[in-house]
Design a protein with these regions (language model features):
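Short, basic, low-complexity termini and linkers enriched in Ser/Thr/Gly/Pro
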Residues: 1, 131-148
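Compositionally biased, low-structure terminal segments
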Residues: 6-7, 128, 141
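Conserved metal-binding segment of the jelly-roll/cupin
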Residues: 113-129, 148-150
Length: 150
């Protein structure tokens, strides 16, 4: 028997920012979930977004309690869509719409991501992103649609 994994895609109040909830299989041994599937993301998110996104780089960072990382953004032509998930600990992740001419310019969506919930947030290009660490030794996984240019 082949099990098909599912993720739930939830729209937020700002176009381009989505909450991603994976299906988690838990039992007495622990848990298992597919943290990302490009195929399933395309099937479920592309109709909402109106375009597909191919994530090409995967980053991980560890931060201590009280650290605030942000507001980070990229300028054209290096703007990135991001898919952010907290692996361990807790982080308040904030996405701010900095798209000129957008009806939600200057507005933000904040999501409390924890290593216990396994959910993530998809952030569109031309958004500023900030992460505020609210647990000791928090680990964040961050996928991006464009290779970082340092």
């Amino acid at each position: 028997m082949c099990i098909r994994f599912f993720m739930e895609i939830i729209k937020t109040s700002i176009d381009g920012v989505l909450i991603i909830e994976p299906r988690v299989f838990k039992d007495s041994r622990g848990y298992f979930f597919e943290s990302f599937s490009q195929r399933e993301f395309d099937e479920k998110a592309t109709p909402i977004l109106g375009h597909s996104i191919n994530f090409v780089q995967d980053n991980e960072s560890m931060s201590s309690y009280g650290v605030m990382r942000g507001l980070h953004y990229q300028r054209m032509p290096y703007t990135q869509s991001k898919l952010v998930r907290c692996v361990k600990g807790a982080v308040l992740d904030v996405a701010v719409d900095i798209r000129k001419g957008s009806p939600t310019f200057g507005q933000h969506v904040s999501c409390l991501l924890t290593g216990r919930d396994e959910e993530g947030v998809k952030i569109a290009e031309q958004f500023a992103k900030e992460s505020s660490i609210s647990n000791p030794q928090s680990i964040i996984n961050n996928q991006s649609s464009v290779i970082n240019h340092h």
